[in-house]
Structures are given as C-alpha cells and as structure tokens.
Amino acid sequence: MFDIGASELLVLVIVAIVVIGPKDLPLALRTAGRWVAKMRRVSNHFRAGIETMIREAEMEEMERKWKEQNERIMRETAAQETAAAQGQTPAAAEDQNDPFPTPLAADAPHTDPVMTGPMPPEAKVEARVEEAPAARPGSQQP
C-alpha cells in the first residue's frame, strides 16, 4: 500500500528507537497499530458503501432494460393477436378475448342419470329376483 522497502523500514525502526526510546516503543507501536486498524475499517466501510451504490445502480439499469423488453414483447404479441383476429368472425374474436368462457356440455364430466322418486313396481320385482340366491334342486334353504 505504501510501498515501503526493507531498508526504509529499518531506518524507521532506528529513528523510532532513538526518538521514542526502547521503554515506550511497545506502547507507541500498539497505538500506531490501533490507528492503522481504524483507518482500514473506515476504508473498508467506505469501499463497501461505494460497491453497494454501484450494484444498486446496475440493478436499476437492468430492471429498466427488462421493463423495456417486456413492453416491446407485449406490443408485438398484441399486434400478432390483432392480426390473427382480423381473419375471424366478430363472434369468434369476442370469444377469444372472453376472460371467463362459457363451459361446453362436452367439457362436463359424464354421469349416469339418478332416479330421485320412488321405484316403479316392476323395478322392485327385478331387484328382489336379483337379490334372491338361486335354489338348487334337492337342497334346503335356511
């Protein structure tokens, strides 16, 4: 970062020993280390803020491009639908744009008719005949 070579660092150490003295040198180095750490934290925080702003600007640009592309696609699709609808009858074009189409009888599920009233007398007789087991000749029924 500061591009300090080995010889320059040696000169700084000798000057620090002479000026500060060997007794107070550890305290001075600790204080200098704290200041360097604070400067690094501030610069990292500043860098992170700048990078966040850049990312947000890029996201806004991408969202703007996506919105423009979406609008272009919607216009092209609408133009194709109107071109296709011109060859249809007005009723068919209206049915195409109906958001809730009327269901057709063919779309309904198939069910058998259900009788809701009392059974006719001939149906009762047939039901009894089907329920009764077939009697075998020579065997008794309980």
Curated annotation (Swiss-Prot):
| Keyword annotations from UniProtKB, A to Z | Cell inner membrane, Cell membrane, Membrane, Protein transport, Translocation, Transmembrane, Transmembrane helix, Transport
Give the compositionally biased regions (Basic and acidic residues): 123-133
Where found, per UniProt? Cell inner membrane
Q: Which GO terms describe its cellular component?
A: TAT protein transport complex
Which residue windows does the record flag with biased composition (Low complexity)? Answer: 76-94
Q: One GO molecular function term?
A: protein transmembrane transporter activity
Q: Where is this region: Disordered?
A: 75-142
Q: List residues traversing the bilayer.
A: 1-21
GO annotation terms (biological process): protein transport by the Tat complex
Judging by the UniProt lineage, the source's domain of life is Bacteria
Claim: Plastid is one of the keywords in the record = no
Against InterPro entries, the record matches this protein to: TatB
Quote the Gene3D superfamilies the UniProt record gives.
Answer: 1.20.5.3310
Report how it sits in the membrane: Single-pass membrane protein
Task: Give the chief site where it resides.
Answer: membrane
Plastid listed as a keyword = no
- SUBUNIT field: The Tat system comprises two distinct complexes: a TatABC complex, containing multiple copies of TatA, TatB and TatC subunits, and a separate TatA complex, containing only TatA subunits. Substrates initially bind to the TatABC complex, which probably triggers association of the separate TatA complex to form the active translocon.
Physiological role: Part of the twin-arginine translocation (Tat) system that transports large folded proteins containing a characteristic twin-arginine motif in their signal peptide across membranes. Together with TatC, TatB is part of a receptor directly interacting with Tat signal peptides. TatB may form an oligomeric binding site that transiently accommodates folded Tat precursor proteins before their translocation.
Q: Its family?
A: Belongs to the TatB family.
Q: What is this protein called?
A: Sec-independent protein translocase protein TatB
Organism (species): Novosphingobium aromaticivorans (strain ATCC 700278 / DSM 12444 / CCUG 56034 / CIP 105152 / NBRC 16084 / F199)
